Amino acid sequence: MCGIVGYVGDKQAARFLIEGLTKLEYRGYDSAGIAVYNGESDAIRVEKSVGRLAELEKKIDSNVPVGCMGIGHTRWATHGGPSDLNSHPHTDCTGDFAVVHNGIIENYLALKEELIEAGHVFKSETDTEVLPHLLETYYEGDFEAAVRKVLRRIEGSYSIVFMSKADPDTLICTKQDNPLVIGLGEGENFIASDIPAIIARTRRTYIINDGEVAVVKKDSVWITNRRGEPITKKVFEVNWNAEAAEKGGYEHFMLKEIHEQPKAVRDTLSGRIAKDDSAVILDELKWTAEYVNSFSKVFIIACGTAYHAGLVGKYYIENLARVPVEVDIASEFRYRKPIIADNTLTIVVSQSGETIDTLAALKEAKRLGSKTMAVTNVVGSSIAREADQVVYTWAGPEIAVASTKAYTTQLIVMFLLGAYMAGLRGTVEDSRMKELLGKLRNIPAQISETLEDVDPIKAFAQQYGYNDDVFFLGRALDYHVALEGSLKLKEISYIHAEAYAAGELKHGTLALITRGIPVVALATQKSVYEKTLSNIKEVKARDAVVIGVAAKGDTELHKYTDHVIFVPETDELLIPLLTVLPLQLLAYYTALTRGCDVDKPRNLAKSVTVE
């Protein structure tokens, strides 16, 4: 979850370090720090602060660290609470070495005991601090050789940048299971844990892979593997618009990203439907009927919002392709001894492509012999590189912690995948396929239409925004969307929200329904519509306040609810792409009503890179 930046060049490092860390705020953090080497004083100056980056900027405002080489870090506490001492960068006993690190050093306790016995004095509770002390131990005049000795001692997942006072023009970085990128400039080079940190400075990058070690100077980058053998890297040209990481006139990134969904969905669909709507085109996969028919089962593995997308994906693949699907929470999958064979397909879903539990589950599935595929939004991410095949969602950068456009584009890819498999298996009639894909083409315009009328949702948020509890109900696909709506509300407004399959009300949930409790009820699935109405009547009979979500043309729901939010009519398989929109907006405006930090909700991070 941490953010890492590094700079070496002819310019003052501090300015870039703060700028780069600001671009990584979406990753979540509780403290920040920078270390800059000053050639005149021949010293590494470290400055840290708990809280937002603004606190660090305020601290150094009147005395900015001077120097042309430095490293910076935003920390999300894992070992030791948020404090100045636990913040990065960390140094050794002499102050000659500084290190920033993202991830976990699993064997740090044993290393720490060893170092303490050797006379080293530790200042923090972190696992990271063993790194500069190990570097101090092994340094004998050769910075790179010392780093390699350190790397041979540590176990875990990490991205690390090392800095040495004795090597004032050199940073050394490496990674294992955590992202790291090098930006290539003119007379300067940059290091970051994610591309947004450097995009304003350069579009030419090296994506660092696991086990690679990069020696970064202002005019050169030398990359080798752990054995010291040179690696030739291809320059990756970033084609993002630099303005894509800005709010674009919206009050919050989340609201901007909600309104970017028509474009994000359109981009994700682009080139993936035949011109006559007869078939799905996924050139990334190039599957054959024989290959798809070999699947005895599909696993979908993800966390959080991506898990909810996976639940909808299960419905799509089973309904269209008629292949059994099991959906797993990534953090549970690898510990339950799943039954996997070489005729199993494992699909992992992650917006960032760096979710550590999902990455670990992917590796476990591969170890067990499964074919693997990733659905992710970030080209060159760890999950994208680890999976056998990748289908990208073209959502563009998503900055707000609460995922919106990543979710809808994940649903698009899941539907495309189900239809693609169905086409190869012959499980959907041609006329039905054309009908579905034709309606899918209309979804971006229907999303725009849905997002136009937000005033009723604002009113609901203001009216019910201070309730302690909110319940969401639905059946079939409506239930899966209800789960996502509940998550959105709780994560950014801090309201206790729960989603239930409407048919489960009598099995316990009904005991919680009392006068005035808001209940959001989705009723768009025709096959279970009457049963859903019956469940809505049950909560209404307990004096709940019911907000219904229905397709335009529904003339029944308003009779049993206090309010109804309508979305455009489409096929019931596709309607989750529309019904989730008012739930996203309801969460946003409720959080706004309650004065919450919409883009950076407490205790949460955008990219979860520790288990």
What are these regions (language model features)?
Residues 68, 72-85, 276-289, 313-349, ...:
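Glycine-rich oxoanion-binding loops at beta->alpha junctions
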Residues 1-251, 260-296, 335, 430, ...:
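Conserved short alpha-helical segments that host acidic/polar catalytic motifs at enzyme active sites
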Residues 545, 558-560, 570-611:
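Generic C-terminus detector
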Residues 261-265, 269-299, 379, 389-518, ...:
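Active-site phosphate/pyrophosphate-binding segments
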Residues 154-188, 460, 465-491, 528, ...:
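Acidic/histidine-rich
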Residues 293-442, 524-565, 586, 594:
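Glycine-rich phosphate-binding loops that contact phosphosugars or nucleotide phosphates
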